[in-house]
Amino acid sequence: MDLSSLRPAKGAVKARKRVGRGPGSGNGTTAGKGNKGQQSRSGYQRPVIEGGQMPIYRRLPKFGFTPPNQKAVACVNVAQIQMWIEKGLVGEEISVLDLKHLCNASNQEYFKVLGNGELTSTVTITAHFFSKSAEEKIAKAGGKIVKAYRTLEEAAKVNGLPFEEALLTPKAKVVKVKKEKKSVKS
């Protein structure tokens, strides 16, 4: 017995259905698609065809829009942070990486700390945004706030800076340079 002689058990692997290979196979001619019509053709078919009726997507009015520069923001309450401290999940310093793991968030998300609940522990929290009530509660408990400017994904792409430092450096503002008009020579 060797590797080349090993085979799956009989009946364990079902044979692939080969359609359109002649009428004798039982799946020839129309290849299981029936006769004529849009579903029998190749390529794209609209998922919902309502016949002559006005389709639902045209009956309903257009509504709102999605802003192109929208930021994905994960929110964390002060009460959640206190609970994590009591459970021993975080220490006195809470970084953006800690928030990412505890909130099960992605690398593209910004983090905002909200002031719902009470905070009794002294902590240093690094996040992108803080509500006024959260700032007050953290300061009242003797903690500190550190503002991050980049997402984890953006910080990883910054060359020449350590990861933690890249998180805390503000992004350079984009300055549009006006081109001078060329003078027409006469």
Curated annotation (Swiss-Prot):
Residue ranges of the region described as Disordered: 1-48
Gly residues composition bias: residue spans: 21-35
Keyword set, alphabetical order: Ribonucleoprotein, Ribosomal protein, RNA-binding, rRNA-binding
One Pfam entry name: Ribosomal_L27A
Signal peptide: none
Gene Ontology terms: cellular component: cytosolic large ribosomal subunit
Record-linked InterPro entries: Ribosomal_uL15, Ribosomal_uL15/eL18, Ribosomal_uL15/eL18_sf, Ribosomal_uL15_bac-type, Ribosomal_uL15_CS
GO molecular function: rRNA binding; structural constituent of ribosome
SUBUNIT field: Part of the 50S ribosomal subunit.
Entry similarity comment: Belongs to the universal ribosomal protein uL15 family.
Function: Binds to the 23S rRNA.
Full protein name: Large ribosomal subunit protein uL15
Organism: Chlorobaculum tepidum (strain ATCC 49652 / DSM 12025 / NBRC 103806 / TLS)
Gene name of the encoded protein: rplO
